[in-house]
Every structure is written in structure tokens, then in C-alpha cells.
Amino acid sequence: MRLLYLNPNATEAMTESMALVARKAAPEVEIVAWTNHLGPTAIQGAEDGDAAVEGLLSLLPKAKDAAVNAIIIGCFDDTGLRRIRAAAHCPVIGIGHAAMSLAALHGSRFGIVTSLDISVPVIAANVDLYGYRDACVGVFASGL
């Protein structure tokens, strides 16, 4: 299996760090990791997320040529997930959606802690979109 980890932001160090973690977690899987060099340096709220989408979409032909089996959007707010899913040649999941799905599978309620207040509305909207409103006790910013 060949998975593509797509970092929506333009920070190469973040891409490398997440790829390292993914490779350790799943050594039997080939992890390809790319940085969205057309995106902002960080995804902090809806405006940054919106600014990242075109760059992510521009990477999809390359992803198809690279014969990846699935794409992971490597930002908890699942930047551009719906548009990328609609345009991709393969399954696409965001790490936020994956985390919420896993938490819900365990059958207990869960909460989400993010770093900045500006990220709360985007993540809270995703909780609703994915159908986890009743399972999620809230989305909170740590201020870190």
C-alpha cells in the first residue's frame, strides 16, 4: 500500500515530522509525504484553510501519476477534504475525521483540544458535518 500524506501548509519541517511518525506507526506501508508549497506557512482558521485548497488540488495529478492508494490530509481541520475527495483518483481522509471516527468507535464521548481559538469554529463545524455532535463534548483552544 502506498499512502500520500499531504501537508496543507508550506512548512517542510512539519511534513517531515509527520512522515517520520507515520512511517514508525506503519512500517509496512509506503508513506509518501508532500508539502503544499502554495499554501500558508500554517493553517490557523478558515482563511488559511481556504488559501491552501488550490495548492492541494494542484498536487492531485502528481498523486495519480505516483499511483498512491489513498491520500491523508495532514491537518486536523481537514483542509479542503470535500473538494479533494471529489477530485482525487483514490480515497481521501483527513486526520481530524479519522480521529473523530476512531474516538466514536470506542463508544464513549470525546473532546477536542486545538491550539488556537480561531481553529475552534472550523473543527466544530466538522464535528457537525461528520455527525459526531452527540459524541463530542466540545472543541476547546489551549492557547498554546
Q: Model-found features: residue ranges?
A:
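N-terminal glycine-rich anion-binding loop in soluble enzyme alpha/beta folds
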Residues: 1-55, 115-144
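Glycine/small-residue-rich loop that forms an oxyanion/phosphate-binding "nest" at active or ligand-binding sites
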Residues: 53-108, 112
